Amino acid sequence: MSALCPLPTPPASEALLLAQARQLSGYTLGELAAMAGITTPKDLKRDKGWIGVLLEIWLGASAGSKPEQDFAALGVELKTIPVDSLGRPLETTFVCVAPLTGNSGVTWETSHVRHKLKRVLWVPVEGNRSIPLAERRVGSPLLWSPSEEEDRQLRLDWEELMDMIVLGQVERITARHGEVLQLRPKAVNARALTEAIGARGEPILTLPRGFYLKKNFTQALLARHFLLQNP
């Protein structure tokens, strides 16, 4: 009988968090769901955040969708990342919703993006769609903070994107803007509009936007830490 069980309360230290995350490595999502007493969906079409929720249960995460980090007492954010058979990310990584108004005086140092990425527990998960969801395995975790160079890359992109938002150019921003950080619409449906600033400084309604890490950024950080081949 396995002694492994979900943490009932948030871990008291990074070491305890990492130890629990390491214990999950090698298990399938179906095994972890069964041990936690929750049902595994057939796919993620209607349950896009299910993997993250499952791992939050196992790791004792506290924040849910609140603005603080998932492990607020530790200042650590949990990010699951679907990878291919070579350990390369299969998609961009959501960071946080972008503020489209009220941005006067905001700096990179005080930004929500930097706050969310200050300390991240990355948990790779098999993401190939040919593998049934229940059979996808959890990989080795990585506790990461941005290096000086990574912080510089993120800051430059964030400043460029925020300048465009403040100057009323939000609707001109595409996913191609930014080297490592991009801004994309994030809405359940096209009717979920939010207020922003237009080209002449007037209030407009537009789709909510989210900040996402591009795959080249997450691939490089995973490759560096797991010594994967980085093409």
Curated annotation (Swiss-Prot):
UniProt KW Electron transport keyword: no
Primary location class: cytoplasm
Pfam families for this protein: MutH
Xref: SMART domains: MutH
Compartments reported by the entry: Cytoplasm
Function: Sequence-specific endonuclease that cleaves unmethylated GATC sequences. It is involved in DNA mismatch repair.
Family affiliation: Belongs to the MutH family.
Identification of the protein by name: DNA mismatch repair protein MutH
Originating organism: Salmonella paratyphi A (strain AKU_12601)
